[in-house]
Amino acid sequence: MIIGAATLLSSCQTYKVSHTYNPPSFNQRVVKGEPSIKIDKINDVRNLRGAELGAIKNEVGISIKSIQAKQPISEITRTAFSHALKSRNLLAEIEAKYLHQADVLQFEGSQYSTQNAECRIRVHLYQAKTGRLIYSQYYYSTKTKVSPNVSYWSNVEEIAVVASEALQDVVDRAVDDQKLRRMLR
C-alpha cells in the first residue's frame, strides 16, 4: 500500500499546451515601419529538452505534471516574432534589407507555490547583403501569477498563459526597441 501511494504521488504525467502571441490592439500605440526584416534562424539553446516548458510541483517539490509545448519552442518564437513584425509593418516577405535571428536562451513555465514563467531571448540583426551583424541585444521577462490551486488539479493551461505573456513581453520589447528601430533607418 505504501509503495502504491508513493508511486501515485511521484508519477508525473505530461501535458501539451499551446502558446499564443496577440498582436497589439487598435488602442495600443505601436510605431509602424517599412517592410525590411526577414526572419532567418531561431535557435532553441535552452537547458530544457525539445518542447519541454516546466512542471507543476506538489507541496514537497516533486513534479506531478510535466508541461510541454505542442510545437517546438523555436517555431513558437518564430511565429511570435512574425506576428509582431507584421503588425508593425516591418516584416518583409521578399527583398529584405535585414535578417532577424534569435537565440531562445530561456523559456519556461512552472508552478510550485505560484505560477511563474521566464523568457530570455538574444536578438541579432544582420544586413542581408553583407551578412554583417549590426545589432545584438538580450531581452528578458518574468511573469508571476498567484494561484489558489497548488496541487494535482492545477491547470496547465493557466501556466501556458503566463508563459505566453512572458514571451509576448520579450518579443514586443525587442521589436519596439528604439535602438533597433534607429538601425532600420
Model region roles, listed by residue range:
Residues 1-2:
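Sec-dependent signal peptide recognition
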Residues 13-30, 88, 129, 133-185:
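C-terminal/domain-edge helix-coil "capping" segments
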Residues 63-71, 112, 152-157:
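Second-shell loop/turn segments in exported
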